[in-house]
């Protein structure tokens, strides 16, 4: 250090000093600046009381802090000087926005404003220019079935559901990797305290009784292997990991029950595939489905005699990380043949995320018998990844087929800020409010009645909203103000009906020797029950509890 160093503190010393000084400043701000600590606490109490009464499901940083500190107090990352906003899901966020603003106004607070946030379908409430909460739209059929823990009377989204958000971040290098520094440690601690089930028994799926289905699935794979912008995930990726490790023991090849793949050109590829796949058999049909929450976009399911054989998803303006590999044909567990062709399979992180998402989907569809399969699939991915890394003396961040944090990805990306900007421009052209905003003392701001896009994941029954047709209605199922809607067009009608999807419920697969055919009439009756379900995953329940359903798999005790 020279004699003329103006700042003579070393970097390691600075980090300690800065942290301590920052806490001092936070306390002084709460004591000396407006809004003060008393006002902040009053507003928080009102927001939390409302969230409790409405049984809204909390997510985000506030929720992560709750679940971590609930199990281990020193894992809390917020302290008494922090004022984090409270994020929660709601099937009617605009109703909540108005109600909360009115309550706060009645309590005498000033400068109350509710308005759209920077990311779509999310709304913020400010009091005295400070942000206190954000509410995000979640379709009712998803909302009613999202698992949660109840902590201090609050419904906190279940840690296993939170994991999806982490993997969405990991698999979104373009837009989300800047969040790593803050979230990585949180996820590691969440994984420590609320681990996914560790399963000792291997994944096994028996062959279809109709051996022709295997042949059809193999033929569909041949068609898909010729497309350059398709990324495979799910059971095909699992078998490829088995092939990669040459493992024939506990994690052996499985009979692939159906194919799952994503594309960044959903309509173009979808139209081509309908034509090409339909030529394979006159017994092949298909159905289109709405996006499923924030998790994936429009999708199409191909069926062979009513049995799902291929799930085809839109990338939903996300860039999907992938690895290019040799195309290996897995017609059944014994007929495995490598080719010289190349295909793309999802990165390890993407495959885990997809399985976690489908766990939510089968819960929404009240088809929890698939839980066992999906948890075993996740365990298989992890075990095979670890085996491959051990065989090749690699780390998970080293470049390999099973690597994490993959930057190579497929798809055009659009940021949430750009989406909101384009939405504002579209509204202005229609002479509509640029931003949905509500202030209790301005009645003119009350006059909005907004219809959210259908993201229920249900089948598209309104022909005007089909995407895989010659001339699709591009604006169908866009968010809109009610007076924009055509009188003869009810785009969201499927969202409030009983979920009658046949995409997963009709899977005729044997697992552990049990025939998994489902009776359609029984499914409809079950759906009437499930849409009224609001069950909590309390700690007194088994770790594998899923509402009333207890899965069959065995857990290794930790």
Question: Where are the model-predicted features located?
Answer:
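Active-site nucleotide-donor binding segment shared across nucleotidyl transfer reactions
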Residues: 40-94, 98-99, 216-265
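N-terminal regions immediately upstream of nucleotidyltransferase
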Residues: 1-45, 151-218, 439, 456-479, ...
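Amphipathic alpha-helical segments
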Residues: 93-107, 265-281
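Charge-rich, solvent-exposed alpha-helical interaction surfaces
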Residues: 17, 21, 46, 103, ...
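Active-site and adjacent loop segments of nucleotide-processing enzymes
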Residues: 51, 135-208, 308-466
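Conserved catalytic core of two-metal-ion nucleotidyltransferases
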Residues: 103-144, 276-320
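Compositionally biased low-complexity segments enriched in polar/charged residues
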Residues: 55-63, 67-68, 78-82, 132, ...
